[in-house]
């Protein structure tokens, strides 16, 4: 025990007092040397071999590793720290200066936290913020910011960083897609804008051209007349096109037209009636003549002398028959003509008059009428078309056939060919006004011969004119026959 002496003076003398010194308290010494409870509990928890699967020392024994954070927070924290928040445990480690060693796992280390050296825990102190003014206050704020950033890094760890990186990647992909879409939209908008600008430029050019044309047209004095003329021409062309586009319907006249004669579209071809139509036109003219006598051969002849002379000129009459009546129209066409009377004397007179003036059938080109004959009449002999009569006036054909309506035809509907010369109606009138053959046949032979030559030449001339009109006898052949009477 230590004794301290204290000297006091009372006026003239000193006095000595002895007082005992105070003894140190053991509890205060222990409390000053003991580590913080958080560090002690953490050390005991890590050093426990029963929990090595959850938390244990590292291989270097200078740090500890939390292998299973969920089980650590669920089982160990409530037993030692009365809470189950792993983030709070990490923040508490940060206040005592622990750092995260490996970013991929929860490994923490401190210089005073080593395996087997628990006494070093006393060197670990808790970090406190400074309360000074000025620079001290700024240093405290800076240290607090560093502590918060370090604590944030410690709290995030491996899994937090991976999640953050994945989230940032997703955001980046979304932003890139949006950027690509906006660029495509901008490109399409630029293309549309360029197209619109080109259209506007073309419209402006057309307007300028239109205005310049109108200015020149107004200054031109013939503009209005030319414009009206072009309009009329266009209307006329449209009308012609509409007229030509209409289908033309032909009248049904009973004439069979071959397919070969069909004209191509858009061509104008002159209509040329076939030869049988011309023959029908000739028989229409002959129908208007007065009836004549018929000879033994049934030919159409004028006044004659006797049947004896007619039979003597049989060869000549056959030649005439070969020219004029060898290829006759069909029976239906002949039946429409009126009966003609003749006498045997007409045969000789006509034969002598036409023997030298009409050439042989070989020198002539005659139309073919055989295609007009029906099948039932083509096998009959030519004599069936005529009926000889030696007794005077008898019709050329049977009058009863003319009554049959089935054999009649309308001749007025057949058009005439424009290439044929017009009919000499004056000649037909003279033929109609001539007197028929007299019943008295007792005239002198000289008068009969003279009358026969005159009548025969006249009738031959008339027949030549009609034949020339039909186109059966060419003008060259007719001139040759007239030079050799």
From Swiss-Prot:
One of its GO terms (cellular component) is nucleus. It is found in: Cytoplasm; Nucleus. Residues 441-455 have a biased composition (Polar residues). It comes from the Eukaryota. GO terms for molecular function: DNA-binding transcription factor activity; sequence-specific DNA binding. A motif (Nuclear export signal) lies at residues 472-480. GO terms for biological process: response to heat. Transcriptional regulator that specifically binds DNA sequence 5'-AGAAnnTTCT-3' known as heat shock promoter elements (HSE). Belongs to the HSF family. Class A subfamily. This is Heat stress transcription factor A-1d. It comes from Arabidopsis thaliana.
């Amino acid at each position: 025990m230590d004794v301290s002496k204290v000297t006091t003076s009372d006026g003239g003398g000193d006095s000595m007092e002895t007082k005992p010194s105070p003894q140190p308290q053991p509890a205060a010494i222990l409390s000053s040397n003991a580590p913080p409870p958080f560090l002690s509990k953490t050390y005991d928890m890590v050093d426990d071999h029963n929990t090595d699967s959850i938390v244990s020392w590292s291989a270097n024994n200078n740090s500890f590793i939390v292998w299973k954070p969920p089980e650590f927070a669920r089982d160990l924290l409530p037993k030692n720290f009365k809470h189950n928040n792993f983030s709070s445990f990490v923040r508490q480690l940060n206040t005592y200066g622990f750092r995260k060693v490996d970013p991929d796992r929860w490994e923490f280390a401190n210089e005073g936290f080593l395996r087997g050296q628990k006494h070093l825990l006393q060197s670990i102190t808790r970090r406190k913020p400074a309360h000074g003014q000025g620079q001290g206050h700024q240093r405290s704020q800076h240290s607090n910011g560093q502590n918060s950033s370090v604590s944030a890094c410690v709290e995030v760890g491996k899994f937090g960083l991976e999640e953050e990186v994945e989230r940032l990647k997703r955001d980046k992909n979304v932003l890139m897609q949006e950027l690509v879409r906006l660029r495509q939209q901008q490109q399409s908008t630029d293309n549309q804008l360029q197209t619109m600008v080109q259209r506007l430029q073309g419209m402006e050019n057309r307007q300028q051209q239109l205005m310049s044309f109108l200015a020149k047209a107004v200054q031109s004095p013939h503009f209005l007349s030319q414009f009206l003329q072009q309009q009329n021409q266009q209307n006329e062309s449209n009308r012609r096109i509409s007229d030509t586009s209409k289908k033309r319907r032909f009248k049904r006249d009973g004439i069979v037209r071959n397919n070969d004669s069909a004209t191509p579209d858009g061509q104008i071809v002159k209509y040329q009636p076939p030869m049988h139509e011309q023959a029908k036109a000739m028989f229409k003219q002959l129908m208007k003549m007065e009836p004549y006598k018929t000879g033994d051969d049934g030919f159409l002849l004028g006044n004659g002398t006797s049947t004896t002379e007619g039979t003597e000129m049989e060869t000549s009459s056959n030649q005439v028959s070969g020219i004029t009546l060898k290829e006759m129209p069909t029976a239906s066409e002949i039946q429409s003509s009126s009966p003609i009377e003749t006498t045997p004397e007409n045969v000789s007179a006509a034969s002598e008059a036409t023997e030298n003036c009409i050439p042989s059938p070989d020198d002539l080109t005659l139309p073919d009428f055989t295609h007009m004959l029906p099948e039932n009449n083509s096998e009959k002999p030519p004599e069936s078309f005529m009926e000889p009569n030696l007794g005077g006036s008898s019709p050329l054909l049977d009058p009863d056939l003319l009554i049959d309506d089935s054999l009649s035809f309308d001749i007025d509907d057949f058009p005439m060919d424009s290439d044929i010369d017009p009919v000499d109606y004056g000649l037909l009138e003279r033929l109609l006004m001539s007197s028929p053959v007299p019943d008295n046949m007792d005239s002198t032979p000289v008068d009969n011969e003279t009358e026969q030559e005159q009548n025969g030449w006249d009738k031959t001339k008339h027949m030549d004119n009609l034949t020339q009109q039909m186109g059966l006898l060419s003008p060259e052949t007719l001139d040759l026959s007239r030079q050799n009477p």
